[in-house]
C-alpha cells in the first residue's frame, strides 16, 4: 500500500530565528542546524550549539523518533533523533517529520526516505537552480510504501546488517591493501640490497631475502 506522507506523519518547518544565533554554553536549549548532520545522516548531539530560550513552547521541542529532513542541498535525506536528545529544536530551513508510530516506525520511514529510489524521485521534484529545495507541500505528498509494522522492522534490521557487513568488508579491504603495500615496499628494498650485494660480490647470499619476499607476496595474493 502507498500513502502520502501527510497521512502518516506531521511535517512542519524548523524554528525560524529573527536574528543571528547567539550561542551560550550555559543555554537550556540545544539548536540543531544542517551542519550538525553528517554525510551518513547521523546527528551528532555532542557538538550542538546551545542558547537561552526561556519562553520556548514545548511543541517546538524535538522528540525521540522525529526525523530531521534536509530540505535544501545536494541530497534531501533525513536523520533520526535518538534517545537522550534533551531540550532541542530544529532550525529552518530544515523540516521536522513526526511519524505516527502506530502506523509506521521512524527507522523504516528514515530508510525509505533515504533510499536511492526515493532520493531520485525527490531530486526530480526539487525546485530552484543553484540550490535545490524540497518544500513542505512537496514532502507532504511524497508517496510512502507502507508494509505491516513487523515487515517494516525486518526491513530496517536487514538494511542495518547489510550496512554493517559492507563497512566490515571495506575495513578488511583497506587492511589488505595496506599489507600488500608493505610487502611490495619490502620486496623493492630487498631487491635493492640484492643488487648492492651483487655489486660487492655477495652473490647468492643476497638473493635470499628478495626470494622470500616474493614468495610471501605470492601467498598473500
Residue ranges and their predicted role:
Residues 22-29, 48-49, 60-62, 80-92:
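Short, surface-exposed loop/turn microsegments at beta-strand edges and helix-strand junctions
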Residues 56-57, 84, 129:
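A structural connector/turn signal
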Residues 106-125:
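Glycine- and charge-enriched low-complexity intrinsically disordered segments
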Amino acid at each position: 500500500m502507498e500513502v502520502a506522507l501527510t497521512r502518516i506523519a506531521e511535517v512542519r518547518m524548523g524554528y525560524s530565528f529573527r536574528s543571528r544565533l547567539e550561542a551560550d554554553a550555559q543555554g537550556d536549549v540545544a539548536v540543531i542546524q544542517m551542519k550538525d548532520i553528517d554525510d551518513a545522516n547521523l546527528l551528532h548531539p555532542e557538538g550542538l550549539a546551545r542558547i537561552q530560550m526561556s519562553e520556548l513552547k514545548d511543541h517546538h521541542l524535538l522528540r525521540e523518533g522525529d526525523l530531521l529532513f534536509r530540505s535544501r542541498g545536494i541530497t534531501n535525506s533525513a536523520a533520526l533523533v535518538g534517545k537522550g536528545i534533551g531540550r532541542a529544536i530544529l532550525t529552518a530551513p530544515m523540516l521536522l517529520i513526526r511519524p505516527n508510530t502506530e502506523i509506521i516506525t521512524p527507522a523504516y520511514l528514515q530508510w525509505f526516505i533515504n533510499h536511492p529510489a526515493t532520493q531520485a524521485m525527490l531530486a526530480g521534484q526539487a525546485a530552484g537552480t543553484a540550490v535545490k529545495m524540497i518544500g513542505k507541500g512537496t514532502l507532504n505528498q511524497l508517496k510512502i510504501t507502507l508494509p505491516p509494522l513487523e515487515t517494516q522492522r525486518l526491513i530496517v534490521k536487514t538494511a542495518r546488517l547489510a550496512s554493517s557487513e559492507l563497512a566490515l568488508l571495506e575495513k578488511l579491504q583497506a587492511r589488505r591493501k595496506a599489507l600488500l603495500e608493505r610487502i611490495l615496499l619490502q620486496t623493492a628494498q630487498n631487491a635493492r640490497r640484492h643488487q648492492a650485494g651483487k655489486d660487492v660480490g655477495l652473490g647468492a647470499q643476497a638473493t635470499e631475502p628478495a626470494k622470500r619476499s616474493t614468495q610471501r607476496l605470492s601467498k598473500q595474493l
